Every structure is written in structure tokens, then in C-alpha cells.
């Protein structure tokens, strides 16, 4: 049984979150949580919350055994970007893109 959890509009760029997502793809959830706990990146905290949510969904909604679960799929898509302005010299301005991402974690007992 596959169970999904999604975090939309996470305030980190998809490029940065994908570095962390690649670390846990295909691992058992216990090993993935341990990896994320000791990964020194902001994105690790974001991915860990989504993984914990997927585990809770599997346990509560599907009655799955946590020990059998593994990370079947994890992918990160780009979300909308917030446009901000950075004042520059001589009255000019640059546009700053505050990027967001959508993190999707699928856990499965197979």
C-alpha cells in the first residue's frame, strides 16, 4: 500500500531540497529518518517533516506497520517564486526571486 504526504510552497529552492531527497530515496524509513536527523542542511528538516507525515498517514489511514515501510518515491518540484526588489546604485533595482518548492514523499510497505 502506497501512502503520500506533500509539503507545498516549502521556502527553499528545489535544487537545494533535491540534494537531501537523493540521500533517502529507496531506504527504509527508520534509516531515512536517522540520515535526515544528522544531515546539516535546512532542507533536511523540511524533508524530515514530510517523511514523518507520510509515516503517520500510513499508520493511521492504512494501518501499516512502520517497520515494513520504505521510501518508495520522493520528488521535489518547483513551486511559485516570490518576486522581490533589491535597490541598487543610481536609482536602479534588481529583481530577487525567493524560490519555493513542492516536496512529495511516497512510502510503501512493498
Curated annotation (Swiss-Prot):
<dbReference type="InterPro" id="IPR036394">
    <property type="entry name" value="Ribosomal_uL22_sf"/>
</dbReference>
<comment type="subunit">
    <text>Part of the 50S ribosomal subunit.</text>
</comment>
<keyword id="KW-0687">Ribonucleoprotein</keyword>
<protein>
    <recommendedName>
        <fullName>Large ribosomal subunit protein uL22</fullName>
    </recommendedName>
</protein>
<keyword id="KW-0689">Ribosomal protein</keyword>
<keyword id="KW-0694">RNA-binding</keyword>
<dbReference type="GO" id="GO:0006412">
    <property type="term" value="P:translation"/>
</dbReference>
<dbReference type="InterPro" id="IPR047867">
    <property type="entry name" value="Ribosomal_uL22_bac/org-type"/>
</dbReference>
<keyword id="KW-0699">rRNA-binding</keyword>
<comment type="function">
    <text>The globular domain of the protein is located near the polypeptide exit tunnel on the outside of the subunit, while an extended beta-hairpin is found that lines the wall of the exit tunnel in the center of the 70S ribosome.</text>
</comment>
<dbReference type="InterPro" id="IPR001063">
    <property type="entry name" value="Ribosomal_uL22"/>
</dbReference>
<dbReference type="InterPro" id="IPR018260">
    <property type="entry name" value="Ribosomal_uL22_CS"/>
</dbReference>
<dbReference type="GO" id="GO:0003735">
    <property type="term" value="F:structural constituent of ribosome"/>
</dbReference>
<comment type="similarity">
    <text>Belongs to the universal ribosomal protein uL22 family.</text>
</comment>
<dbReference type="InterPro" id="IPR005727">
    <property type="entry name" value="Ribosomal_uL22_bac/chlpt-type"/>
</dbReference>
<dbReference type="Pfam" id="PF00237">
    <property type="entry name" value="Ribosomal_L22"/>
</dbReference>
<dbReference type="GO" id="GO:0022625">
    <property type="term" value="C:cytosolic large ribosomal subunit"/>
</dbReference>
<comment type="function">
    <text>This protein binds specifically to 23S rRNA; its binding is stimulated by other ribosomal proteins, e.g. L4, L17, and L20. It is important during the early stages of 50S assembly. It makes multiple contacts with different domains of the 23S rRNA in the assembled 50S subunit and ribosome.</text>
</comment>
<dbReference type="GO" id="GO:0019843">
    <property type="term" value="F:rRNA binding"/>
</dbReference>
